[in-house]
């Protein structure tokens, strides 16, 4: 059958547009009987008549619509004006605008050749049988096709009595009006013929079925293809008559043909019979089929009346004349609109276009030219007969046919086509089978072992099916995906499609191969993020069998619904105890981004042959006995508890109640159903049916678990034990033993007391009765016993803290206690009994005991009154430290309390104190030195102050002040309205100012009651200006050093309580070393070279008193300082203490960011590193050539070491016990980061996780220092259970430990990156503090507290609102890098300029580095590149600023405008009244898959789901020069999690070097592999500046320990000398 041409849209003309087609007239008549209101009737009729109206009328109708929408016109007025307009301009009464066409012998719109009826007859499946004709009913797409329709009754002609548009427009019955003009060539014969045709048409009108449906299709096609024509002349009538004669001849022969049968197996065999017939019977306005001229003669059917040469010549001349006439008419009419322009015009008008009819079975448009299935293969047989063929048999006479009766044979199938029961080619992946639509297929079946895709050796089959299931297989890493059909008789593996089915199957193959990529990727990367998935998609080469050059992100989004469905199907084939891979982070991101609908029926689609091995990714964890004991013995008890809680809550959280999965009944077959009472089970498990587990709720729970606790509410601090009502003491029960030790302050102290005949003395431990009897007994150490003046018998309790009251919670050892800084005076009557608490000191050989069998029992613990402790616990900071070594003296041994002493020291340290007084004048005391928090401040010292402490004379504008918003053209920028918030992620708009800095000129305070009032100390100081505080504003600070200041003689008086710390400010010319060496010599160092005069706004030479800090201020001129000023306290220079570098093992090292920071801090020498990923391991080797890098599994290496091996299989030397002094690393949380509950299913994975392996490394090697780095959510995973167990293991080993969250942006990088850090120090070492922030940063990104079990924990950091230095910006980071284009791949290029900022100078280094490496960026697809080009270059711009225009891409493809065809109930209409919705879900309905749009400049998926995801703010966003990077990820994608990855001024994503700089890597640092490998190395790394800051804190601990050791050695030497 020749391909039919698509209906052509023609412009409306001022000349007559032709009469109405028959189907329109019939529909108009039906409307009168539908009982519609006047408004509905008008709307429906306008819908039908719209394309037949003239251009001028359409324009006026659109104006009326606009006025109606803007409420400038009432609804009644609108209807009246529409009627008036049409009656005035389109009425027949004026005789000028007739819409009818003269009956000149031209073929009618409704005419239809005989072959179409026969085609409809024969195109049915065997299941479709003739049905009895029923009474006439309104035509619809769902009418059943008629089988036996007379060919002569099908061909109809248009009557000369045509109904006008206005006659149909008015509501009410309409009568036909006879035509007044005489028709040319109207003879008695033609009139009789017309009467016959009318009669036949009336017969056809009463029929329902195939003939009516096909006739309706042809009438639509003919009506839409009808173009403007000149009045036909007499010769046109003659040609038409001759053509009609040929048609009648063909019909007679067709009617007489006895071989024609209305069966699907024969309906295509006679297809060629109608080819010539179709060409000869086409309407005059229909273009000639060009393929007809090229057909060979043997293809023409013999029964067709031959066309004479004269007829062909006349036809060709007629065609030429019609083309010429059309060109003349088009030159005077409105130009033809493009498809996108027509859609845009229609979106503004309420009047929709006429919907083309659809097939009631497959739902496809009947005017699709490629709709029909052509023909069956030769000698095709039915399925049962085909299956009995010997060609398909693989068994011999001795073989068993089936193993069981339930088994089905499996064959291969090639040259196949799939079609519905009406013969329309159908895809199988659009949900038709799931909707129970019967699909059949034909082709050639072959034996299962035959892999030749040709039809040779096979047997042809027809009408196989219907298809019960279609399935996929081959997710095993191979090249091919197997696609199969299942019928009631057999299963078929598809090979190659037929030629006609190839385009449909090609689209299906693309989405299937993408699904294969996704499933196989997630098998080994269950924790991959969206950017990782895009990386995999874009780097996979498509197979040659599909017509696709490359896979892109747009390909994934286009097929997202299908891909997610396949992943869900894959999960259904897995075991119940396996985590669904569709809950992985990348799949959840895809679901949200593409707006995928979950929970749809998948019963007819399955995944076969899943070959993924269980727990394939990590090997079984190698654990030490201590770690194994904690995880496998104790924690299993907690698992049972959480399992019980999960089961109780399972039914509540398993349903959303909306999706199809939730609404379907229980299957009755799964494990959960079989346990239900209704299916005969016990009902104990209380689990939902496995088939009804809601995917929407699972995704929501997984999303909730990943959300960080940014806004941590204020939690109550841990309650201290307060004594309740005083108990009435029983003197008989309590009595003092012995004489009083001391009488002091109305208290008589004793050493011993008897309680219930049990002796208790100072230093013993007791259990105390709580006020609430439901709580367990409190435990305390008795530090004092006394009786007050009122006879109350009291004791002082230093409380122990149970493990359950610490951050460890339920994971703690029930026998382990912790000392805390809390104590209280209590009545002796509260004591319950005496208990035994043993101090468990670390053994002398502690470091070498790693990996051995730990002690599991505590002697005497069976009595229930024996406990042990080994650490002090700080409840506010969650720090476990070694207990203080303070010993009692003779003066305080009767009341020695560690808690009291510690609290007294803290209070004494925090209180301001005057150290040296100079003089007193008028009641004011002038001082030379004061102290606070252990820091001494002297005259001439420089101090930090909060930004509000004083102001400057120069008013500086904000560096990121936004310009006023101009009005936006919403037609061009339809998504701009979503930018209602001024907040821009990555902006420093709300970043605080850094500390003010001043030099102390004068210290004074008042007197109170004759004493110095130390609570009211004032400082007079000189102000230092930062560059941004001068008139040069922030532009002046960009090029200067970040620690450069300007001297000023301006003074300010501040409170000493406002001082935040001390710093060093030196005049640059007075330094004995370079400014760079001085700045890097220690923390808090500044310099100045000039003074700033704010009055003249000039920079001057500093005065002498600024250059000579030794000349102290005079205290209002009344005295002079004594001696030379000392900038800092006298202390031993650091250079005098030689600190050997710690021998370090870096596990999960990546490219080496953590080690690089420790190297910069000067504390570490990384001798060993473990990294399985080869590109990262190679990068580590490039930057650390002296390091032994292992590329093996860490579990394998630890197993070798524990077995006593010295080298690995490659001969590399393994570190032995005692070699490793520092262990650092960031173990991936692979396999257990998806959900926030521990249960028996996920527990087994956690036991084998890399966190457990890393802790086993720590236990075996027992390093001096241990650091674990991970994502911020590490502290929140699984009810914080991962954090608790990690700390529990460290405590059990004997380590001091703590945890905290740090923001990398506060340590000198232009990036927000919060990281969880766990620090541990061996017994005898000092546990490091977390480093204080160095730079100010956006407060929104600095929420660093953590809530565990409803308790809020913070770190020791005190700089919460400001910092010493300003924030580092994107401009500081990369403004000096040369410009490159999208896809730049040159790994080495010149800098082409000097560094412009302090940060750039630091990263370039002092060495000569003429080559810039890794300044390369990803080559984005043409569509993404076009979007990037259209993102504006102003701050905060993103996808919402894209114009809605049509663009030609770099590959020549056209990117279309996005069409808005739905009302968005949430966002309303635009200012122009345009719609804002792109899917039916915007109206509150279910999503319509047919609403999807692709290859548009504005990505369709973003406005589709924007209302639910904060309008996708930041996607396709540009970085801001004065802002910062979002967390650098492993693959910069414009639509990825990071969001703003576009260069501020260039149309590309950020380069590898720019990302590396955002992490703080120096330019000399090398990366390895392709561009995506390098991006991944950078994104996974720890920012070296953050690691350096932590390393410097470890260095302070080492220095402190070294000083104490040196002091102890000196003291011991002196004592030895004294003895001698």
From Swiss-Prot:
Sumoylated; sumoylation increases activity. Zn(2+) binds at residues 359, 362, 420, 424. One of its GO terms (cellular component) is heterochromatin. The active site is at residue 1229. The keyword Signal does not apply. Residues 1142-1620 are annotated as: Catalytic. Residues 126-137, 719-730, 1113-1125 have a biased composition (Basic residues). It is an enzyme of class 2 (transferase). Zn(2+) 2 binds at residues 667, 670, 673, 689. Residues 16-109 form the DMAP1-binding domain. One of its GO terms (molecular function) is DNA (cytosine-5-)-methyltransferase activity. The modification Phosphothreonine is found at residue 164. Residues 161-172 are annotated as: Interaction with PCNA. Residues 1-120 are annotated as: Interaction with DMAP1. InterPro entries: BAH_dom (IPR001025), BAH_sf (IPR043151), C5-Methyltransferase (IPR050390), C5_DNA_meth_AS (IPR018117), C5_MeTfrase (IPR001525), C5_meth_CS (IPR031303), Cytosine_MeTrfase1_RFD (IPR022702), DMAP1-bd (IPR010506). Residues 192-205, 246-267, 286-300, 1126-1135 have a biased composition (Basic and acidic residues). Residues 696-757 are annotated as: Autoinhibitory linker. S-adenosyl-L-methionine binds at residues 1149, 1153-1154, 1171-1172, 1193-1194, 1582. It comes from the Eukaryota. Zn(2+) 1 binds at residues 656, 659, 662, 694. Homodimer. Forms a stable complex with E2F1, BB1 and HDAC1. Forms a complex with DMAP1 and HDAC2, with direct interaction. Interacts with the PRC2/EED-EZH2 complex. Probably part of a corepressor complex containing ZNF304, TRIM28, SETDB1 and DNMT1. Interacts with UHRF1; promoting its recruitment to hemimethylated DNA. Interacts with USP7, promoting its deubiquitination. Interacts with BAZ2A/TIP5. Interacts with PCNA. Interacts with MBD2 and MBD3. Interacts with DNMT3A and DNMT3B. Interacts with UBC9. Interacts with HDAC1. Interacts with CSNK1D. Interacts with SIRT7. Methylates CpG residues. Preferentially methylates hemimethylated DNA. Associates with DNA replication sites in S phase maintaining the methylation pattern in the newly synthesized strand, that is essential for epigenetic inheritance. Associates with chromatin during G2 and M phases to maintain DNA methylation independently of replication. It is responsible for maintaining methylation patterns established in development. DNA methylation is coordinated with methylation of histones. Mediates transcriptional repression by direct binding to HDAC2. This is DNA (cytosine-5)-methyltransferase 1. It comes from Mus musculus (Mouse). The lineage of its organism: Eukaryota, Metazoa, Chordata, Craniata, Vertebrata.
